[in-house]
Curated annotation (Swiss-Prot):
Gene3D superfamilies: FAD/NAD(P)-binding domain. It is an enzyme of class 1 (oxidoreductase). This is Ferredoxin--NADP reductase 2. FAD binds at T16, E35, Q43, Y48, I88, F123, D284, T325. Belongs to the ferredoxin--NADP reductase type 2 family. It catalyses: 2 reduced [2Fe-2S]-[ferredoxin] + NADP(+) + H(+) = 2 oxidized [2Fe-2S]-[ferredoxin] + NADPH. InterPro entries: FAD/NAD-bd_sf, FAD/NAD-binding_dom, Fd--NADP_Rdtase_type_2, Ferredoxin-NADP_redctase_2. Coiled coil: none annotated. PANTHER family: THIOREDOXIN REDUCTASE 1-RELATED-RELATED.
Length: 328
C-alpha cells in the first residue's frame, strides 16, 4: 500500500486527465494519476495516434500522439505520480474522510479527493461479423489505424459513415493506391466540412451498400457488398479492410461506486461534483444539461474540478485562482 495520502487522484490518463494533473500542480495539490491501460493517452494513443485533430485551440491541426506528448510534458512539470495498468475496483471512505482506492491488482491508494477523467471508459470495437471475417482480425481486417505507412500502395476499403471513417479515408487517400468508402446510408454522419472534402477527393464512395461476405485464402481478397433495400451485389478486391463501426464502451468497475449514472455517463453539477462528496468528474465521462463532448470541453472542466476539489480540501482556498502569467 502507498501510505501517502494525495490531495487529488485522477482516474484516467487521457487528454483531460493529463491537463487536469497539470492544473492540479498549478494549485499546489499533490496529484496521482491512475490509468487502466499500460500507457497514457487513452483512446488517442490506443486507437488513432497518427490521426490529425483539428478542434484544439491554438493548433490548426495536431497529431493525436503529438498532443498527448505535449500534454505529458506539461503535466510532468509538477511531477505527478503516474500509475499504469490498474483499474480501481473498490472505493471506501475511512473515518478520517480519507478515500481508500483498491485496484484490480490489489494495490491500495489513499486520497482526499477523486477526479474521474476516464473518457468513454473501457471500449471494444463493433466487429465486422460476416462470413469468417473474425479469422482475419490482425491480418488485413483492422478496427483502427496504428501506422499509416502499412497502407502505402494498398487497396483499402473502409466501412462506416462517421467521422473516423471519413477522416481516415481522406488521410489514406494520400498514400494508398485506392481508397473505397462503403456506407449503408446515402448521408454521412461526419462533420459537414469533412464530407465536402470527401466528395471532392478521389475516394470511391459506395452508398447505400452493406458488406455481406468476404472471400479469402490467407487474407481477405474480396469483400462482397449488397445494395441496401436492393438486389445488386458487387465484389471489391482489397488488400486491407478498416471497419469503423464505432466502439462499445463501458464504465467498468466505476459503475459500481454508487455514482449517479445517466446513459453510461456520470452526472455532475456546474462544479463538476458528483453525488458523492469529494468525487468529481470531467471530460467525456461526465454529463450535465447542455454537455458537449469535445477534448476542448474537458480542458475547461478539469480545472473547474481541481479548483472545487481544492476548496473541498481547504474551505479557505480560493476557487478562482491567479492567472498563470502571475505565477511563473
Amino acid at each position: 500500500m502507498d501510505s501517502k495520502v494525495f490531495d487529488v487522484t485522477i482516474i484516467g490518463a487521457g487528454p483531460t486527465g493529463l491537463f487536469t494533473a497539470f492544473y492540479g500542480g498549478m494549485r499546489e495539490a499533490s496529484v496521482k494519476i491512475i490509468e487502466s491501460l499500460p500507457h497514457i493517452g487513452g483512446q488517442l494513443t490506443a486507437l488513432y495516434p497518427e490521426k490529425y485533430i483539428y478542434d484544439i485551440a491554438g493548433f490548426p491541426k495536431v497529431h493525436a500522439q503529438e498532443l498527448i506528448d505535449r500534454l505529458e510534458e506539461q503535466a510532468k512539470f509538477f511531477d505527478p505520480e503516474i500509475v499504469l495498468g490498474q483499474a480501481i475496483d473498490k472505493v471506501e471512505r475511512l473515518e478520517d474522510e480519507t478515500i481508500r482506492l483498491t485496484s484490480n491488482t490489489g494495490e491500495v491508494h489513499l486520497t482526499k479527493t477523486i477526479i474521474i477523467t476516464a473518457g468513454n471508459g473501457a471500449f471494444q470495437p463493433r466487429r465486422l461479423n460476416i462470413g469468417n471475417s473474425e479469422a482475419f482480425e490482425g491480418k488485413n481486417l483492422h478496427y483502427y489505424v496504428r501506422d499509416m505507412n502499412q497502407y502505402k500502395g494498398k487497396r483499402v476499403v473502409l466501412l462506416g459513415g462517421g467521422d473516423s471513417a471519413v477522416d481516415w479515408a481522406l488521410m489514406l487517400e494520400k498514400i494508398a493506391a485506392k481508397v473505397t468508402l462503403v456506407h449503408r446510408r446515402d448521408q454521412f454522419r461526419a462533420h459537414e466540412h469533412s464530407v465536402n472534402q470527401l466528395k471532392e477527393s478521389s475516394v470511391e464512395i459506395l452508398t447505400p451498400y452493406a458488406p455481406i461476405n468476404v472471400e479469402a485464402s490467407d487474407k481477405i481478397e474480396k469483400i462482397q457488398l449488397q445494395e441496401v433495400k436492393g438486389e445488386k451485389i458487387i465484389d471489391v478486391e482489397v488488400d486491407d479492410i478498416i471497419c469503423n463501426y464505432g466502439f462499445i464502451s463501458s464504465l467498468g468497475p466505476i459503475k459500481d461506486w454508487g455514482l449517479e449514472i445517466e446513459k453510461n455517463s456520470i452526472v455532475v453539477n456546474s462544479k463538476m461534483e458528483t453525488n458523492i462528496p469529494g468525487v468529481y468528474a470531467a471530460g467525456d465521462v461526465c454529463t450535465y444539461d447542455g454537455k458537449v463532448k469535445l477534448i476542448a470541453t474537458g480542458f475547461g472542466e478539469g480545472p473547474t474540478a481541481i479548483n472545487n476539489a481544492k476548496n473541498y480540501i481547504d474551505p479557505k482556498a480560493r476557487i478562482q485562482p491567479k492567472h498563470s502569467t502571475a505565477m511563473f
